């Protein structure tokens, strides 16, 4: 099963995260299929960048989002089309 979840990056005590598409049984920072965004909790407010089209593609293919990623996607709605 494929998951969309966070992969920790950054130095000790200075984390930032990549939002990755990865096989569920892989290690947290294992080889990912695709990077679909970033999340930096250290900025104020926390910065989130999402590739919505790719997230929609992978969820359409059956990928499950982790609880935290689902919350980040929900808190950061897509911009309205012009």
From Swiss-Prot:
Q: Which UniProt keywords apply?
A: Ribonucleoprotein, Ribosomal protein
Q: Does the keyword rRNA-binding apply?
A: no
Q: Which Pfam families match?
A: Ribosomal_S16
Recorded hits in InterPro entries, A to Z, give: Ribosomal_bS16, Ribosomal_bS16_CS, Ribosomal_bS16_dom_sf
User: A GO CC term?
Assistant: cytoplasm
The molecular function terms in GO held by this entry are: structural constituent of ribosome
For biological process, the GO terms are: translation
Task: Mark the transmembrane ranges.
Answer: none
Question: Which family is this protein grouped under?
Answer: Belongs to the bacterial ribosomal protein bS16 family.
**Record protein name field:** Small ribosomal subunit protein bS16
Supply the source organism for this entry: Acidobacterium capsulatum (strain ATCC 51196 / DSM 11244 / BCRC 80197 / JCM 7670 / NBRC 15755 / NCIMB 13165 / 161)
**Taxonomic lineage of the native organism:** Bacteria, Pseudomonadati, Acidobacteriota, Terriglobia, Terriglobales
